[in-house]
Amino acid sequence: YLVNGGKSCMAGFVLKNTLSDNGGVTRGICKMDENGNLTEVVETKNIVKTATGAEADGKVIDVDSLVSMNMWGLTPDFLDVLEEGFKEFFEKEVPDNPLKAEYLIPIFIGELLEQGKMSVKVLRTNDTWYGMTYHEDVVAVKDSFKKMLENGVYKADLFSDL
């Protein structure tokens, strides 16, 4: 997308491909316009698998929703914008809480979207997200990566072709 002139994009994972069998997870559910541009990311906590799909705190969640796993495609120009935002963040947020203040890129991008200063194309992926939210997730993730190695998806020496 970026090599063809796009400015900003984000991988949109299908929610059902990002859930843990071992408990609730937090996911950023994407809202988009009719052209597939990101309009908002709604951080949703404690999303759990159910017999019929998924829910968060008793509310049914569409398992086909696209979610952000913070895989952004950004151009070098974005670094200038990011730096300006960081200066403002450092002046306003750090003095109040110097040990815990965090400059979160998704929050910053959300502010830019709200202000109309940025657009982000959501690129749907049907791939599985291999997360390890719970200790019990480790075995399944290891098994999945072992299978991908056996099937040639990845090489044992991941960077051998660089």
Residues of each region from the PLM?
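Residues that scaffold the ATP/ADP-binding catalytic core of kinase and kinase-like folds
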Residues: 41, 81-82, 141
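Hydrophobic helical membrane-anchoring modules
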Residues: 117-119, 126-162
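Alpha-helix/helix-capping structural signal
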Residues: 76-77, 136
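Residues that recognize and position ribonucleotide moieties
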Residues: 71-72, 102, 131
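Conserved core of the sugar-phosphate nucleotidyltransferase
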Residues: 1-72, 76
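A C-terminal functional module that forms or caps the active site or interfaces directly
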Residues: 83-118
